[in-house]
Amino acid sequence: MQFIKYKSYILKFLLVSCIFCINGCDCTILCPNGLIAQEQRFVLFVSFFTMLLIIIPVIFMTIFFVLRYRESNFSKTYDPKWSHSNIIELLIWGIPIIIIVFLSIFSWKSVHDLDPKKPIVSNVQPIKINVISLDWKWLFIYPDQKIATINKLIIPINTPIIFNLTSGSVMNSFFIPSLGSQIYVMPGMKTNLNLIANKLGQFKGFSSNYSGKGFSNMKFDVLVTSDHIFFYEWVKKIQKSKYKLNSMYQFNQLAIPSDNNAIKYFSNLKENLFNVVIANVLKISL
């Protein structure tokens, strides 16, 4: 009987306690590690709190009107013939219009400022990385360094990264939440993405578009190094790798669908491999 008496309080306590359980969740998007992700978080916050300017007053007025004009409230004047108020009309039309205009201008500017193809202004020489999505793994090609990796991306801190992306299979989506923009990749097409990491650390990237049975394991590691010296020492090690990727036969073997792929490094790359993959899909020769 005692339990039944306090049942509602116990349930409320358990419900509120669930909030503290999310303390262990990863809040990647709200804790960015790159300039683009920081700007996107700012856009999210501005849009969210601007819309609260409408939502909060509406909730407040709903509660206020219910209490003030309830049937049992005899202290207020009953005026059934009331039908219009210039002040109310001004508020309920004017404020939403102002907010919509503000969000329109703000969104338009933000979309252009954060265009994935827009180069990042920096005094540091950018690094080019070609990305090919395969079933179910990511191939990262460093064309200037003549190396490639499977499911491993290493970049120096505060260095603009120019990604050229395509798919060697079905349509997919490339996303590193800590650094910013998600972008779709399609076979036979090339798209661009510019990112930069402003904090050291190891982050996760993944496919955010369903692409088959191995989709859930199509993830890769992103390591942000402290300087270019460490990066180029790593490059020299990979250039000595025993695994080669200097022919289309080797690429086609790599492209065979496989799940839960381990990190792998390649040296001695086929010249212009990225463009050849696109050309093969389009059935043209280079």
Swiss-Prot record:
- Keyword presence, Ligase: no
Which sites carry lipid of kind N-palmitoyl cysteine? 25
Q: Which UniProt keywords apply?
A: Cell membrane, Electron transport, Lipoprotein, Membrane, Oxidoreductase, Palmitate, Respiratory chain, Signal, Transmembrane, Transmembrane helix, Transport
Ranges per topology, Cytoplasmic: 68-85
Q: Which InterPro entries match?
A: CcO_II, CcO_II-like_C, COX_ARM, Cupredoxin, CuRO_UO_II, Cyt_c_oxidase_su2_TM_dom, Cyt_c_oxidase_su2_TM_sf, Cyt_o_ubiquinol_oxidase_su2
User: How does this protein assemble?
Assistant: Heterooctamer of two A chains, two B chains, two C chains and two D chains.
Pfam families in the record, alphabetically? COX2 (PF00116), COX_ARM (PF06481)
Gene3D superfamilies recorded: 1.10.287.90, Cupredoxins - blue copper proteins
TM region(s), chain numbering: 45-67, 86-108
Subcellular localization(s) per the UniProt record: Cell membrane
Role according to the record: Cytochrome bo(3) ubiquinol terminal oxidase is the component of the aerobic respiratory chain of E.coli that predominates when cells are grown at high aeration. Has proton pump activity across the membrane in addition to electron transfer, pumping 2 protons/electron.
Q: What is this protein called?
A: Cytochrome bo(3) ubiquinol oxidase subunit 2
Q: What is the membrane topology noted in the UniProt record heading this document?
A: Multi-pass membrane protein
| One Gene Ontology term of the molecular function aspect | cytochrome-c oxidase activity
Signal peptide segment: 1-24
**Which residues are covalently lipidated (S-diacylglycerol cysteine)?**
25
What is the source species? Buchnera aphidicola subsp. Baizongia pistaciae (strain Bp)
What biological process terms from GO does the record include?
ATP synthesis coupled electron transport
GO cellular component entries: plasma membrane
